[in-house]
């Protein structure tokens, strides 16, 4: 019985560590400067000449900044949990974005905006 209890505790701790290490890896991979390369709205690509002005930056202290079109800027704290990216701006407003894909070169985010699904594809420019 003692061996079974020890094994159960080990399995539980292993699962717990794997979840926390996944979040650590995602937080580590997202750190850097990301430039938008494509934007889709309801699966249709948007042709936008100002796409290169959209920049997302994440640092290893949990801070983010966003520069968009029309001189829109935002900054605050971020957190990655599972496949979600939580952004909390300086006014303490939180947004949740779905991470469709994240690796060392590409970030794909999904969000709902005015009842429309928006997909933003970013390419990493700096670590």
Residue ranges of model-derived segments:
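Lipid interaction determinants
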Residues: 22-75, 81-127
């Amino acid at each position: 019985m003692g061996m079974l209890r020890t094994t159960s505790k080990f399995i539980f701790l292993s699962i717990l560590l794997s979840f926390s290490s996944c979040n650590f890896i995602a937080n580590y991979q997202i750190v850097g400067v990301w430039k938008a390369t494509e934007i889709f709205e309801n699966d249709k690509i948007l042709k936008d000449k100002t796409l290169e002005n959209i920049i997302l930056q994440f640092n290893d202290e949990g801070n983010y900044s966003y520069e968009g079109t029309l001189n829109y800027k935002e900054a605050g704290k971020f957190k990655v949990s599972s496949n979600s990216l939580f952004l909390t701006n300086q006014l303490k407003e939180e947004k949740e974005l779905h991470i469709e894909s994240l690796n060392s070169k590409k970030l794909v985010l999904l969000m709902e905006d005015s009842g429309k699904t928006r997909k933003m594809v970013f390419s990493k420019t700096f670590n």
